[in-house]
Design a protein with these regions (language model features):
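Eukaryotic regulatory low-complexity N-terminal regions enriched in Ser/Thr, Pro, acidic
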Residues: 136-187
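Gly/Ser-centered flexible loop/linker motifs
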Residues: 132-134
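Polybasic, low-complexity terminal segments and linkers that are predominantly intrinsically disordered
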Residues: 1-30, 141, 174-191
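Short Lys/Arg-enriched alpha/beta "domain-start" segment
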Residues: 22-130, 153-158
Length: 191
């Protein structure tokens, strides 16, 4: 008997526990191939950006743009923070991660969906409280959803405070990354 695939939302509604939400990372392949030289140029330009610029957009969307080193450090701390929040029983948060890849299996962007659990039933709410879209080629993120304030207050702000204490290291990492990217793009142009 052949199993019919179910959508993630169907699995969430049928699931009695949140265990499946955090057990793996789903991969979705997009029908295009990322232009690697353009992506490398964007990354090199991202080294020259301000540490971070963030603002609210229309329809309760939160946008943040980073320089390259800050983005990579932010991503690392973001996953650590979300992991610790989801394992803390008092926060009642769970999450899913979708890696969106191109046809060469390069991760173009990641989508993290954060779900609140219903306190009485301990089941996930049917809709994500908020989604975090991490755009790797532009070193930026876009967050939207009804729980955007939770993201800003409990996730984004503490990570930002932590990163502000590492600005000297970020400058060094950024300079090293820019040099490596410059060498890489000049090597590619000579081929």
């Amino acid at each position: 008997m052949e199993m019919q695939p179910t959508r993630a939302s169907s699995r969430l509604r049928k699931n009695n526990s949140m265990d499946d939400l955090c057990t793996g990372i789903a991969t979705k392949c997009k029908p295009y191939t990322l232009d690697q030289s353009k992506a490398m140029n964007k990354k090199e330009k991202a080294c020259d950006k301000d540490y971070i610029t963030f603002y609210m957009k229309a329809n309760n969307n939160f946008r943040a743009e980073f320089n390259m080193a800050t983005y990579e450090l932010f991503k690392d701390k973001l996953f650590t923070t979300i992991d610790s929040m989801s394992s803390d029983q008092s926060t009642l948060l769970k999450y899913t991660v979708d890696n969106n890849t191109d046809q060469k299996n390069m991760v173009v962007f990641q989508t993290i969906k954060i779900y609140h659990m219903n306190k009485r039933s301990m089941l996930p709410n049917r809709r994500a409280s908020f989604s975090i879209n991490l755009y790797n080629s532009t070193s930026s993120l876009l967050t939207n959803g009804t729980g955007i304030n939770l993201f800003i207050d409990d996730i984004f702000s503490p990570i930002l405070k932590c990163l502000q204490q590492q600005l000297d290291c970020i400058d060094i990492i950024n300079a090293d990354m820019k040099c490596a990217l410059s060498n890489s793009t000049s090597d590619q142009s000579q081929v």
